[in-house]
Amino acid sequence: MGRFISVSFGLLVVFLSLSGAGAGLCCPLDWSSYDLYCYKVFKQQMNWTDAEQFCTQQHTGSHLVSFHSTEEVDFVVQMSYKSLDTTFFWIGVNNIWNGCNWQWSDGTGLDYKEWREQFECLVAKTFDNQWWSMDCNSTYSFVCKFQA
């Protein structure tokens, strides 16, 4: 009887871990996961608006990447450095639609600011945590993100 309860409890734990909250946190095969989100680097180069539109077509809730911690920036910079042969990639912060009100394209709050305002769109460098404002019509690779 004791052995049956132990085995049953073990199976229950496995079942709950597979069917509970963790089950919905899987990213598609070619996406990388970090802190409840899925990320993917795209090598093709597009202007900011086309890259954002492309991201929204990849998965429900997907946008150009937004950053909310230094650790998240580090993760994406490492991922992009390994994948891209270019120095810059588009990120989701802009002030295209709101004049001087900078915001992330996914609607989340702008937690910190690490750039000089010169153009309306931002790129991040593939080898450090610097952000640069660039002409939105320039073409760069980009990273998409969605909540798992």
UniProtKB/Swiss-Prot annotation:
Protein location: Secreted
SUPFAM superfamilies: C-type lectin-like
GO CC term (a single one): extracellular region
InterPro entries found in the cross-reference section: C-type_lectin-like (IPR001304), C-type_lectin-like/link_sf (IPR016186), C-type_lectin/snaclec_domain (IPR050111), C-type_lectin_CS (IPR018378), CTDL_fold (IPR016187)
Major localization class: secreted
Signal peptide: 1-23
Pfam family of the protein (one): Lectin_C
Family: Belongs to the snaclec family.
Protein role: Snaclec that induces human platelet aggregation in the absence of any cofactor with the EC(50) of 0.25 nM and causes tyrosine phosphorylation in human platelets. Antibodies against either platelet GPIbalpha (GP1BA) or GPVI (GP6) inhibit alboaggregin D-induced platelet aggregation. Only the combination of these two antibodies completely inhibit aggregation, suggesting that it acts through both GPIbalpha (GP1BA) and GPVI (GP6).
PANTHER family for this protein: MANNOSE, PHOSPHOLIPASE, LECTIN RECEPTOR RELATED (PTHR22803)
Quaternary structure annotation from Swiss-Prot or TrEMBL: Tetramer of heterodimers of alpha and beta subunits (alphabeta)(4); disulfide-linked.
Protein name: Snaclec alboaggregin-D subunit beta
Organism classification: Eukaryota, Metazoa, Chordata, Craniata, Vertebrata
